């Protein structure tokens, strides 16, 4: 019984992560607007804590996604799912 519960919880977690990633991708492609709340999950935005905390220290075209010691991306860059995206 514990095994089935664990499998169910892990499956739900994977589905939530997949749905959030798909919503993020659609937002980047401008298919949905960030203020769209009809998706079932709130879209990820700049105010979420983990947005730039993963690896926004990556450099894109020689420039960092965010300045050293800064909490948010700057210079027209946005950190999305471990990738630097030009806004």
UniProtKB/Swiss-Prot annotation:
PTM (free text): Contains 3 disulfide bonds. Two different connectivities are observed in similar proteins (C1-C3, C2-C5, C4-C6 or C1-C4, C2-C5, C3-C6).
Prosequence residues removed at maturation: 24-48
InterPro entries: Hwtx-2-like
Signal peptide region: 1-23
Keyword Secreted: yes
Subcellular location per the Swiss-Prot or TrEMBL entry: Secreted
Keyword Secreted: yes
Keywords noted in UniProt: Disulfide bond, Neurotoxin, Secreted, Signal, Toxin
GO CC annotation terms, alphabetical: extracellular region
GO molecular function: toxin activity
Main location: secreted
Function: This toxin causes paralysis and death to sheep blowflies. It may inhibit voltage-gated calcium channels.
Further details from the record: No effect of the synthetic peptide are observed on voltage-gated sodium channels from the American cockroach Periplanata americana or the German cockroach Blattella germanica.
Family: Belongs to the neurotoxin 12 (Hwtx-2) family. 03 (juruin) subfamily.
Protein name: U1-theraphotoxin-Ct1a
Species, as recorded: Coremiocnemis tropix (Australian tarantula spider)
Source lineage: Eukaryota, Metazoa, Ecdysozoa, Arthropoda, Chelicerata
């Amino acid at each position: 019984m514990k095994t089935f519960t664990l499998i169910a919880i892990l499956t739900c977690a994977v589905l939530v992560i997949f749905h959030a990633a798909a919503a993020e991708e659609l937002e980047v492609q401008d298919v949905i607007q960030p203020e769209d709340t009809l998706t079932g999950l709130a879209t990820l935005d700049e105010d979420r804590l983990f947005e730039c905390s993963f690896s926004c220290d990556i450099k894109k075209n020689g420039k960092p996604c965010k300045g050293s010691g800064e909490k948010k991306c700057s210079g027209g860059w946005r950190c999305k799912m471990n990738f630097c995206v030009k806004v």
